[in-house]
């Protein structure tokens, strides 16, 4: 198709997929679609799932933060886990000590032994997300080793490229390292993210190979939205969009009834996220630097984690 030169404007708006009035409706419609059309599949945990392959949603980060409201999302867990990733830690006990126990089951003695990691300390998850983000390609020894200067610091390279060459199409961070997969307590579900700069805004697209719609996906949406806010802050940009692309999007069979309750609820306005001080580097962020305002979710819905 030919386009008249007068229509080509450097300041043209970024094309956006059609999104419903409230961003959360995208998530709820995905859940409804999987319940209606999903294929019943067996899975690693033995729980069983309803599964659909290939879904996408776009959440605006402009003056709102996509922390789902049709149930309470564990904001403290989102924040502490992301700071733990950024630190490069692979020690589940560091999170546990802060009241965030989402990695406890995968770092337990029984689980590690079941994978053949009997020589590994309890809590040592292997070269998972934080290690790949900050030390990709380094040889993993254990969770207590000092990896300073080893491997590729993908996160810092992302930040540096956004500052120096924002139009680059290779602003990518990848946690999927085939060499290290056999050493991980859990291979990465959220595998690769790409950043995009236009009109002074930073957007992020996540490719998530495996999405647990009941428990994991609401958490992952908030986590990568938060990462986008953080990187935008230190690169002098405004948050744009978070685009969430799912591979195997699934509902565990024991989550169907809880999710039916969630689908009956009307979304409430998304909260706002404030960063309370000027932070210069990604490693300097602290828990107290963030404030969620106006979060008024529906009550918690209990769902069991499949391990």
Swiss-Prot record:
<feature type="binding site">
    <location>
        <position position="306"/>
    </location>
    <ligand>
        <name>(6R)-5,10-methylene-5,6,7,8-tetrahydrofolate</name>
    </ligand>
</feature>
<dbReference type="InterPro" id="IPR045097">
    <property type="entry name" value="Thymidate_synth/dCMP_Mease"/>
</dbReference>
<dbReference type="GO" id="GO:0097421">
    <property type="term" value="P:liver regeneration"/>
</dbReference>
<feature type="binding site" description="in other chain">
    <location>
        <begin position="250"/>
        <end position="252"/>
    </location>
    <ligand>
        <name>dUMP</name>
    </ligand>
</feature>
<keyword id="KW-0808">Transferase</keyword>
<dbReference type="InterPro" id="IPR036926">
    <property type="entry name" value="Thymidate_synth/dCMP_Mease_sf"/>
</dbReference>
<feature type="cross-link" description="Glycyl lysine isopeptide (Lys-Gly) (interchain with G-Cter in SUMO2)">
    <location>
        <position position="302"/>
    </location>
</feature>
<dbReference type="GO" id="GO:0005737">
    <property type="term" value="C:cytoplasm"/>
</dbReference>
<dbReference type="GO" id="GO:0060574">
    <property type="term" value="P:intestinal epithelial cell maturation"/>
</dbReference>
<feature type="binding site">
    <location>
        <position position="212"/>
    </location>
    <ligand>
        <name>(6R)-5,10-methylene-5,6,7,8-tetrahydrofolate</name>
    </ligand>
</feature>
<comment type="function">
    <text>Catalyzes the reductive methylation of 2'-deoxyuridine 5'-monophosphate (dUMP) to thymidine 5'-monophosphate (dTMP), using the cosubstrate, 5,10- methylenetetrahydrofolate (CH2H4folate) as a 1-carbon donor and reductant and contributes to the de novo mitochondrial thymidylate biosynthesis pathway.</text>
</comment>
<keyword id="KW-0832">Ubl conjugation</keyword>
<dbReference type="GO" id="GO:0005634">
    <property type="term" value="C:nucleus"/>
</dbReference>
<feature type="modified residue" description="Phosphoserine">
    <location>
        <position position="108"/>
    </location>
</feature>
<dbReference type="GO" id="GO:0042803">
    <property type="term" value="F:protein homodimerization activity"/>
</dbReference>
<feature type="binding site" description="in other chain">
    <location>
        <begin position="189"/>
        <end position="190"/>
    </location>
    <ligand>
        <name>dUMP</name>
    </ligand>
</feature>
<dbReference type="GO" id="GO:0006417">
    <property type="term" value="P:regulation of translation"/>
</dbReference>
<dbReference type="GO" id="GO:0006206">
    <property type="term" value="P:pyrimidine nucleobase metabolic process"/>
</dbReference>
<dbReference type="GO" id="GO:0006231">
    <property type="term" value="P:dTMP biosynthetic process"/>
</dbReference>
<dbReference type="InterPro" id="IPR023451">
    <property type="entry name" value="Thymidate_synth/dCMP_Mease_dom"/>
</dbReference>
<dbReference type="GO" id="GO:0005759">
    <property type="term" value="C:mitochondrial matrix"/>
</dbReference>
<dbReference type="GO" id="GO:1990825">
    <property type="term" value="F:sequence-specific mRNA binding"/>
</dbReference>
<dbReference type="GO" id="GO:0007623">
    <property type="term" value="P:circadian rhythm"/>
</dbReference>
<keyword id="KW-0545">Nucleotide biosynthesis</keyword>
<comment type="subunit">
    <text>Homodimer.</text>
</comment>
<dbReference type="GO" id="GO:0003729">
    <property type="term" value="F:mRNA binding"/>
</dbReference>
<dbReference type="GO" id="GO:0046653">
    <property type="term" value="P:tetrahydrofolate metabolic process"/>
</dbReference>
<dbReference type="GO" id="GO:0005542">
    <property type="term" value="F:folic acid binding"/>
</dbReference>
<keyword id="KW-1017">Isopeptide bond</keyword>
<keyword id="KW-0496">Mitochondrion</keyword>
<feature type="compositionally biased region" description="Polar residues">
    <location>
        <begin position="7"/>
        <end position="16"/>
    </location>
</feature>
<dbReference type="GO" id="GO:0019860">
    <property type="term" value="P:uracil metabolic process"/>
</dbReference>
<keyword id="KW-0539">Nucleus</keyword>
<keyword id="KW-0489">Methyltransferase</keyword>
<feature type="cross-link" description="Glycyl lysine isopeptide (Lys-Gly) (interchain with G-Cter in SUMO2)">
    <location>
        <position position="286"/>
    </location>
</feature>
<keyword id="KW-0999">Mitochondrion inner membrane</keyword>
<dbReference type="GO" id="GO:0051593">
    <property type="term" value="P:response to folic acid"/>
</dbReference>
<dbReference type="GO" id="GO:0045471">
    <property type="term" value="P:response to ethanol"/>
</dbReference>
<feature type="binding site" description="in other chain">
    <location>
        <position position="220"/>
    </location>
    <ligand>
        <name>dUMP</name>
    </ligand>
</feature>
<dbReference type="InterPro" id="IPR000398">
    <property type="entry name" value="Thymidylate_synthase"/>
</dbReference>
<dbReference type="GO" id="GO:0048589">
    <property type="term" value="P:developmental growth"/>
</dbReference>
<dbReference type="GO" id="GO:0032259">
    <property type="term" value="P:methylation"/>
</dbReference>
């Amino acid at each position: 198709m030919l386009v008249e030169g007068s229509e080509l404007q450097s300041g043209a708006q970024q094309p956006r997929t059609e999104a419903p009035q409230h961003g959360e409706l995208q998530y709820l419609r995905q859940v409804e679609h999987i319940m209606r059309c999903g294929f019943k599949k067996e899975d690693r945990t033995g729980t069983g799932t309803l599964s659909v392959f290939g879904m996408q949603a776009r959440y605006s980060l402009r003056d709102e933060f996509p922390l789902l409201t049709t149930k309470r999302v564990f904001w403290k867990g989102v924040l502490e886990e992301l700071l733990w990733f950024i630190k490069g830690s692979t020690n589940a006990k560091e999170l546990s000590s802060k009241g965030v126990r989402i990695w406890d089951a995968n770092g337990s003695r029984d689980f590690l032994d079941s994978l053949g990691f009997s020589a590994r300390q309890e809590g040592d998850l292997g070269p998972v997300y934080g290690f790949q983000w900050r030390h990709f390609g380094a040889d993993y020894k254990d969770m207590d080793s000092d990896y300073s200067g080893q491997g590729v610091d993908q996160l810092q390279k992302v930040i540096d490229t956004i500052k120096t060459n924002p139009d680059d199409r290779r602003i990518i961070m990848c946690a999927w390292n085939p060499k290290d997969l056999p050493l991980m307590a859990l291979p990465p579900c959220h595998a690769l993210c790409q950043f995009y700069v236009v009109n002074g805004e930073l957007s992020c697209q996540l490719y998530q190979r495996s999405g647990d719609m009941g428990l994991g996906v609401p958490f992952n949406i908030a986590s990568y939205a938060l990462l986008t806010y953080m990187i935008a802050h230190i690169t002098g940009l405004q948050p744009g969009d978070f685009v969430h692309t799912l591979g195997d999007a699934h509902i565990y069979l024991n989550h169907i009834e809880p999710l039916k309750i969630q689908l009956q609820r009307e979304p409430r306005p998304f909260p706002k996220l404030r960063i309370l001080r000027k932070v210069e580097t990604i490693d300097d962020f602290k828990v107290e630097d963030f404030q969620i305002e106006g979060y008024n979710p529906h009550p918690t819905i209990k769902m069991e984690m499949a391990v």
